Amino acid sequence: MAKSVRSSKKKVKRVVTDAVAHIYSSFNNTIVTITDRQGNALSWATSGGSGFRGSRKSTPFAAQVAAERAADIAAEYGVKNVDVLVKGPGSGRDSAVRALNAKNLKVTSITDVTPLPHNGCRPPKKRRV
């Protein structure tokens, strides 16, 4: 019995020149996601996925490495300009934005979108070390 030969079409990567970089920086980790204007993810990277474990995940250097990895993958889509949306109280916010700028991505705007409660839920108790 002869096998049927199927011709497979190669998936062509779409070209996106303007993108949005979402940087979520918590006290423990930093997540960098680069999306198109509609919100479809092009690339993402985390400081934990970049090889940092434990308390080193929350460092500014780990956030810088994560932003560089996300920018490298986004460059394959032809991304040139990024709007940056920063969320969270972590230490990797500034270094992630600087890393995107250093990777030849033109940062057009930086917006802080950290959610602030209008006195909603009770916060966690203070740590006693």
Swiss-Prot record:
Gene3D superfamilies hit by this protein: Ribosomal protein S11 (3.30.420.80)
Key word Oxidoreductase present: no
Assembly and oligomerization: Part of the 30S ribosomal subunit. Interacts with proteins S7 and S18. Binds to IF-3.
NCBIfam families, per database record: PRK05309.1, uS11_bact
GO biological process per UniProt: translation
Native source species: Francisella philomiragia subsp. philomiragia (strain ATCC 25017 / CCUG 19701 / FSC 153 / O#319-036)
UniProt keyword list: Ribonucleoprotein, Ribosomal protein, RNA-binding, rRNA-binding
UniProt name for this protein: Small ribosomal subunit protein uS11
Gene that this polypeptide is encoded by: rpsK
Family (UniProt): Belongs to the universal ribosomal protein uS11 family.
One Pfam family recorded for the sequence: Ribosomal_S11
Molecular functions per Gene Ontology: rRNA binding; structural constituent of ribosome
RNA-binding found in the keyword field: yes
GO-annotated cellular components: ribonucleoprotein complex; ribosome
Function text: Located on the platform of the 30S subunit, it bridges several disparate RNA helices of the 16S rRNA. Forms part of the Shine-Dalgarno cleft in the 70S ribosome.
